[in-house]
Every structure is written in structure tokens, then in C-alpha cells.
Design a protein with these regions (language model features):
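Flavin-binding catalytic cores
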Residues: 223-256
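Conserved N-terminal helical subregion
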Residues: 1-6, 48-179, 218-234, 263, ...
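Histidine-centered metal-chelating micro-motifs
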Residues: 156, 175-177, 197-200, 282-283
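Active-site substrate-recognition segment that forms the wall
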Residues: 189-221, 237-240
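Short gly/ser/thr-rich secondary-structure transition/capping motifs
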Residues: 117, 131-133, 192-193, 238, ...
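C-terminal helical "tail/cap" subdomain of flavin- and related membrane-associated enzymes
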Residues: 2-4, 66, 246, 289-290, ...
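Short phosphate-binding/catalytic loops that engage adenosine nucleotides
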Residues: 27, 60, 242
Length: 372
């Protein structure tokens, strides 16, 4: 199996992790990326300890930790700053590892070190998905591969060509993301909840804080709003307690705010024959469990192990899907449960979180304590 011809499409977090894991297992995958240069969004990444555990297996935990903030607690407040939930991350995750947060660009840089990537190339068509897969690239050239893995994100070309033509669907939330200078009071993961709104701030290394804000729009509200995102944020989150006013006051350039609807894949699908999906291409979902990167890193480790241990590509693919599907389906279900809780009337939501927030947190994350 080490001689298997493997194409990985997409050099985001999922594709880079997969290429790295495959190389560790003795394979020589070809990794291609549509973009002709790196242009990583100026946002942040929060990695719960199961994701950090996966990075440890990829040989990157120490390098990531050196650039990241350790996140000791998750605090949920109402919009006036009153505590609803205060969960101890070190106590919950125990020896599995720390929870870390850092700029997305720095995590991407660490993942791509030592991993060859062919830039400015993508897939135009896929033939014989049962294998060997005939691939035509966007420059008209072609090649055959024993396995093609689409790790090309929520709007995956590989998914559209071979697995599921349906586009992602909105979950009913609009998001704004940006980085800001870190005020002294931002020491850990902290979210403030309003009526149909939330504002999250996370330290992401020395001097920086990652801010994520969203508003519930309803299922039809998939399009990004027009206009000035800075003004939108200031209007939507007027009246929120610290640190929100100070963070919004820092914003002086609308181009630094990344605005997008929150979307998920129409249905969790893993592939067709020797065309496989990984990361968001397979199971993209709402970010409210902060598991997008972590699940992608776990996918990378499990797929490499299945290919190493199986006798055939089809056996490896079947083993991979059997191991990953229950875990990713669980996380997807929890994102829906969390959305239902946050969309309760504020007085009822706050009562539920004050009374049962710790129990809810543990129930949502407990299965992720188990190794992959």
C-alpha cells in the first residue's frame, strides 16, 4: 500500500494535516492547492484538547504551543457581563492536553513546513470513481490515482464533482470575525450572549485577541449583509459589557472584518469508491463546538492509519468511514443542540445555562475524551 498513488486536493488545514500524516505513515501523496499564493484569513483558531492531542501525533504540539495562548476556562456571560457558566478546561480534559488558541495563519504556516504543495492547480473532472480514478486538472493535463481525497473545504470541488452536487446550506446565523489588540481583561475564552446574538473573544498568543460575533437570521438568511461591517457590529452589539465596546472601538478598517453566513454541508457524506472526503468537505458544520480543525486533524491521523494497515484501498476507506462517522455525526448533533439552547428566549436560556451549563458542557464534549 505504500506505493499507492494518492492525490490530496486542497492545502488548507485539513489537506496539510492529511499530507503530513500520510508522509509519516510512509506514503508520498501529491498535494495540490487552487490558489497560486498563500492568503490566509486574518482570524484565529481555538483548539480544544482533542485537537491538540492530534497535533501532538503530527509532531506539532510544542511548536503550536510556543505561538499559542493556553485557554484555562470557558466562560459564558449574559450581555451585561453576568456569569452563566464557568467551565475549567484543565479539569475537564485532564492529561489529554491543553486547549490552545492562535492566529489561523500561524497554525497554517506550521502545518505546511516540510510539506510539498503544488500551487495554482485544481481538479476539473474525475472519472472512474471506483478506481483507479482518472483526474483531469484545470490545465488540461491528466493522471491516474488509486485514491483521491477532497480536503478542499465546505465548498469542495471534489465533493461537487463526484459525491454531492448540493451546495452548503445556511444554519441561520451571520458571522463577523476579526483580530484585535488584546486588552488586559481578556484572559480566556469568553462569550457574551444577547437576544439572538453572541460575541466571543479568545486570546491568541502575545498581544492578540480573536473576536467572533454572530447573529441569528433564520434559515433563509444565508447571504452576507451589504454595507459597512464595522457599523453593523457596533449597532448589533451596542450595550454589551466589556470587553466588547473596547474591541469594537479598535476597528478602523472594514477590510479587516471577515463577514460570512454560517453554513454546513447539506448531508454528511464521505465519498464514492476511491474518491474520499475529509475535513469540512465531508462534515462541515457550525463552529459552535470549535471542532472544525480538530476533526480535520483526527481525520488525517485515522485515514493514514487505515491506509497503512489495510490490504486494499476499499478496505482502508471502509475502515476510515466506520471509525470517523460516529464521532463527526455526534459533534454535528451537538452543534444543533447548542443552537436550540442559544435561541431560547434570553430569560429561559440564562436560567438553563446557570442551572445546567456545566452538565451540558460535559455531555457535549465527553465522547471527545476518547482517542481516535
Amino acid at each position: 500500500m505504500e506505493a499507492a498513488r494518492i492525490l490530496v486536493v486542497g492545502a488548507g488545514l485539513a489537506g496539510l494535516a492529511l499530507a503530513r500524516s500520510l508522509r509519516q505513515a510512509g506514503f508520498a501523496p501529491e498535494l495540490i492547492e487552487r490558489a497560486d499564493r498563500w492568503d490566509i484569513a486574518g482570524t484565529g483558531m481555538y483548539l480544544p484538547a482533542n485537537g491538540v492531542r492530534a497535533l501532538r501525533a503530527l509532531g506539532l504540539q510544542d511548536a503550536v504551543a510556543a505561538r499559542a495562548s493556553d485557554i484555562p476556562r470557558q466562560r459564558v456571560l449574559d450581555h451585561r457581563g453576568r456569569v452563566l457558566v464557568d467551565a475549567d478546561m484543565h479539569q475537564f480534559w485532564g492529561g489529554i492536553g491543553p486547549c490552545l488558541a492562535l492566529p489561523r495563519s500561524e497554525l497554517h504556516q506550521l502545518l505546511r513546513e516540510g510539506v510539498p504543495v503544488r500551487m495554482g492547480r485544481t481538479v476539473r473532472s474525475l472519472e472512474r470513481p471506483d478506481g483507479p480514478v482518472g483526474v483531469t486538472f484545470d490545465d488540461g493535463s491528466g493522471a491516474e490515482f488509486d485514491l483521491v481525497v477532497g480536503a478542499d473545504g465546505l465548498r469542495s470541488t471534489v465533493r461537487r464533482l463526484a459525491v454531492d452536487r448540493r451546495p452548503p446550506i445556511p444554519v441561520g446565523q451571520q458571522s463577523w470575525r476579526f483580530l484585535a489588540a488584546r486588552p488586559a481583561e481578556v484572559t480566556t475564552w469568553t462569550v457574551l450572549l444577547g437576544r439572538g446574538t453572541s460575541f466571543l473573544s479568545i486570546p491568541v498568543g502575545p498581544g492578540l485577541v480573536y473576536c467572533y460575533a454572530d447573529v441569528t437570521t433564520g434559515r433563509a438568511g444565508g447571504a452576507a449583509p451589504n454595507g459597512d461591517p464595522v457599523g453593523q457590529l457596533r449597532r448589533r452589539f451596542a450595550g454589551f459589557a466589556a470587553p466588547v465596546p473596547g474591541l469594537l472601538e479598535q476597528l478602523d478598517d472594514p477590510a479587516k472584518v471577515h463577514v460570512a453566513p454560517i453554513e454546513q454541508v447539506a448531508e454528511e457524506r464521505w465519498g464514492r469508491g476511491a474518491v474520499l472526503l475529509a475535513g469540512d468537505a465531508a462534515h462541515g458544520m457550525s463552529p459552535n463546538m470549535a471542532q472544525g480543525g480538530s476533526l480535520a486533524f483526527e481525520d488525517a491521523l485515522v485515514l493514514a492509519a487505515c491506509l497503512r494497515d489495510a490490504g486494499t484501498i476499499s478496505d482502508a476507506v471502509a475502515a476510515f468511514v466506520a471509525r470517523r462517522s460516529p464521532r463527526t455525526a455526534w459533534v454535528r448533533a451537538q452543534t444543533h443542540r447548542r443552537d436550540r439552547t442559544r435561541n431560547l428566549p434570553p430569560f429561559l436560556r440564562d436560567l438553563v445555562l446557570r442551572s445546567f451549563g456545566q452538565r451540558i458542557f460535559r455531555s457535549h464534549y465527553r465522547p471527545l475524551l476518547d482517542p481516535v
